[in-house]
């Protein structure tokens, strides 16, 4: 009888534990305006644009700034490893990057600076305020976006000065 009571207690305990774990996993975070959804796999979906972004920029992943060629290599590595089980990551266009800028929101400050990063707080904190895009600008320069102003910048492709990137892909809800 005592053994049976212990067995029933253990079964009930593990059932409660399983239900709680499922609820925690099933509840995804959304931004205050419900536009961005944290997929809990290192990605964030944008319901307005249909784009899926990597939550943390390349600086937060690697701990160092990158130039434009390294940004392309970073994206290739995401695809080789199948980051979040996707193999179609790309460098964003300047237009895609600009969709992340929101003057009303402050994510954090750029690491090592007072520069405020104006993107949704669901994204990783204290990353780079300047992200490379896929758009080249002549032979030696490439474009990106600065997230304290939302402006497009053009810099030498070999410049690493406080620059990173963030992978993007087109998503559908039918993963």
Q: How should these model regions be labeled?
A:
Residues 59-61, 96-98, 137-140, 151-152, ...:
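Solvent-exposed loop/turn segments at secondary-structure junctions
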Residues 25-89, 164-168:
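Extracellular adhesion/carbohydrate-recognition regions
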Residues 17-34, 108-112:
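Short, basic/low-complexity N-terminal boundary segments at the transition from targeting/disordered tails
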Residues 130, 156-175:
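Short, structured beta-strand segments at or near domain termini in extracellular proteins/domains
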Residues 72-88, 94-144:
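An exposed tryptophan-centered "aromatic clamp" motif
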Residues 145-155:
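Low-complexity, intrinsically disordered Gly/Pro/Thr-rich segments
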Residues 9-18:
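Bacterial N-terminal signal peptides
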Residues 1-10:
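Bacterial N-terminal signal peptides that target proteins for export
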């Amino acid at each position: 009888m005592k053994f049976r009571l212990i067995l029933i207690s253990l079964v009930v305990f593990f059932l409660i534990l399983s239900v709680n774990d499922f609820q925690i996993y099933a509840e995804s975070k959304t931004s205050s305006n419900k536009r961005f959804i944290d997929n809990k796999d290192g990605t964030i979906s944008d319901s307005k644009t249909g784009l899926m972004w990597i939550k943390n920029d390349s600086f937060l992943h690697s701990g160092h700034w990158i130039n434009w060629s390294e940004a392309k290599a970073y994206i290739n590595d995401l695809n080789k490893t199948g980051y979040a089980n996707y193999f179609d990551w790309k460098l964003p266009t300047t237009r895609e990057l600009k969709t992340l800028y929101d003057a009303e929101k402050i994510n954090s400050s750029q690491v090592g600076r007072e520069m405020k990063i104006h993107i949704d707080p669901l994204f990783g904190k204290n990353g780079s305020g300047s992200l490379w895009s896929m758009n080249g600008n002549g032979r030696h320069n490439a474009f990106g976006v600065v997230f304290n102003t939302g402006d497009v910048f053009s810099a030498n492709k070999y410049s690493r000065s406080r620059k990173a990137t963030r992978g993007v892909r087109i998503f559908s809800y039918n993963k």
